[in-house]
């Protein structure tokens, strides 16, 4: 909030207590611009701001700031406008420094916390939730694979047993069929079959070969052959 000259003239050191409040450990030095304004002939130089610090129970205690504002001569006149402006600017710059130091200290503390968490070793007792989930899923997968292997073995055994049983049944059925067929053949007597009217059949074939263009001349033989076949069926 101050000018470039005032920002270059400040030198402070700071610390952060347990409530993350910024404590100035060494006093703030006024900038050259503020000092020059306070050295004007109409106003005496301001008294430096003193800060007292102490330790209480091993922790930092808030600084007790005692500011002695410059007064005019023994006559008790009003403070000059230049001095008021310098004090006001000093207070504004001091507040800006406090805020900036607080932000820097907060970022450093967050970075240190993240670094300490990242550097912690992971032991057997501190397995993360994702690792526990992975272990559980791996065990479930192994259990399912074992169950599938057991079922596969069971089904293969059942299939082999069914195939053996079917082969035995086929063999038994084939033996029974051949045995029944043999018995049936033994009960049936063979019958001799002779051609009917074989003489007339030979004459008809000879007539057709000799007279291919006069087949009507063979009609008498055909009629005789038909009568012979009818008589054989009746007899």
Swiss-Prot record:
Residues 129-176 form a coiled coil. Pfam families: MIC19_MIC25. It is a lipid-anchor. Induction: Down-regulated following genotoxic stress. A motif (Cx9C motif 1) lies at residues 197-207. One of its GO terms (biological process) is cristae formation. A motif (Cx9C motif 2) lies at residues 218-228. Keywords: Coiled coil, Disulfide bond, Host-virus interaction, Lipoprotein, Membrane, Mitochondrion, Mitochondrion inner membrane, Myristate, Phosphoprotein. It is found in: Mitochondrion inner membrane; Mitochondrion. Residues 194-235 form the CHCH domain. Component of the mitochondrial contact site and cristae organizing system (MICOS) complex, composed of at least MICOS10/MIC10, CHCHD3/MIC19, CHCHD6/MIC25, APOOL/MIC27, IMMT/MIC60, APOO/MIC23/MIC26 and MICOS13/MIC13. This complex was also known under the names MINOS or MitOS complex. The MICOS complex associates with mitochondrial outer membrane proteins SAMM50, MTX1 and MTX2 (together described as components of the mitochondrial outer membrane sorting assembly machinery (SAM) complex) and DNAJC11, mitochondrial inner membrane protein TMEM11 and with HSPA9. This is MICOS complex subunit MIC25. The gene is CHCHD6.
């Amino acid at each position: 909030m101050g000018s470039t000259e005032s920002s270059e003239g400040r030198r402070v050191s700071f610390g952060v207590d347990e409530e993350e409040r910024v404590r100035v450990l060494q006093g703030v030095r006024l900038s050259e611009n503020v000092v020059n304004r306070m050295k004007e002939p109409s106003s005496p130089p301001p008294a430096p701001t003193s800060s007292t610090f102490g330790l209480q129970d091993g922790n930092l205690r808030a600084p007790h700031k005692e500011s002695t504002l410059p007064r005019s001569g023994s006559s008790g006149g009003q403070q000059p406008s230049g001095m008021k402006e310098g004090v006001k600017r000093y207070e504004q710059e001091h507040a800006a420094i406090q805020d900036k130091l607080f932000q820097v200290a907060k970022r450093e503390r967050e970075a240190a916390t993240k670094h300490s968490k990242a550097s912690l070793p992971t032991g057997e007792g501190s397995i993360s939730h994702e690792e526990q989930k992975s272990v559980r899923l791996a065990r479930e997968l192994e259990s399912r694979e074992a169950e599938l292997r057991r079922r596969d073995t069971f089904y293969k055994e059942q299939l082999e047993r069914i195939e053996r049983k079917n082969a035995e049944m086929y063999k038994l059925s084939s033996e029974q069929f051949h045995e029944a067929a043999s018995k049936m053949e033994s009960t049936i007597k063979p019958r001799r079959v002779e051609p009917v009217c074989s003489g007339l059949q030979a004459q008809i074939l000879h007539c057709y070969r000799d007279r291919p263009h006069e087949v009507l001349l063979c009609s008498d033989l055909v009629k005789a052959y038909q009568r012979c076949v009818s008589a054989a069926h009746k007899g």
